[in-house]
Amino acid sequence: MGRGTVWFLRAEAALYAGFLALDLAGTGGGWSLALKYSGIALCLLSALLRAGDREGRLVCAALALTLSADFFLLVLDAWYALGVALFCGVQGLYLARLRAMGAGLWLPLRLGLTAAALLAAVLLGLLTPLNALALVYFPELVCNAAAALSLGRRGRMFGLGLLLFVGCDVCVGLHNLAGLPVPLSAFAQVGMWLFYLPSQVLIVLSIPKE
């Protein structure tokens, strides 16, 4: 492991411990937000320093969109549809990376899951523009995680990162459910970033070494 990677992991660990401590103490606020956003920005910077081939450049582009999406969803706490649309773009770029790695398209599963999710939303009267975007995005993330893990050792780090990404988004969904039991809601509140920053760190580390 190179010196740059060691310092990257140390910095991310410090940011991670900082915002988790603030969130668990219930005193997060602006400081926690700043630490979280800095963690994602540092992931992009590290990816830019590591990128050398097409896979690396695709990850950099995806992390740039991730940072932009988090600006709307985390920093501004507004423009949610735009933020989710940017995350759809992130998954599109990760699909392109998976194809470059030799993974299959998994098109029937992607289309089937998306169609089923949208149909369920229609039947339940829950289909809004924001929900539609989320229901297109989430099946893509799940399929990308499965496709990466199916590649074996070569896709393991990337797949684990995407799997933690799934965990984050499950917590986001739970957090937005009305009437959730207080303990589960409290876990979901912390769990979003408990999973999210490590997912991005693993995705950065999955960039092939030159």
Kindly give the residue locations of the regions a language model identified.
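Polytopic alpha-helical membrane-helix bundles and their juxtamembrane interface segments
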Residues: 1-210
